[in-house]
Amino acid sequence: CDDMAKENFREMMKEYPTKGIHFIDGGNYHYLTLLWLSLIEEPFDLIVFDNHSDMQKPAFGDVLSCGGWIRNLVEDSGFKGKVTVVGVDKDNIDKEMKELGVKFITKQTILKKRGQQYGLENELIDKCWTGKRPVYISVDKDVLDEKEYKTNWNQGIMSVDELFAIIEDT
């Protein structure tokens, strides 16, 4: 997504409020979350449910993409809130982003905590919730097990029920 495309998307987004639920395609446009976040004027924390870290450096210049929008947020935007990514494999954690304060709840932690009452919810609260700022939640559908929802990306292990329970209990 180059600068001209970003401006086109921003123009389209103006007619929608930042508060609420935004459904954006099947996962190819998760990077548009960064544009939504740029419209929020008050401090907030971010929780991202995703099977991928979305923290890759751009392959083609300074282009915003689904593979690197969280890196853009942390490195370039002056974002001061906490960022927590839920669902990524432990082997795919970006060490540089971890050093910059991004927290991760891995696929392995989800499996370990599965079945424990409030296990994952407590993990999420401990890692990211300050109680001082609102929380923006972004869900990439590829965090879900493919039995729950089929995307065109490799997928995670969460059920829809797990995802909703975590969001409701957090």
Question: Which residues does each predicted region cover?
Answer:
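Conserved alpha-helical scaffold segments that buttress catalytic/binding sites
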Residues: 1-170
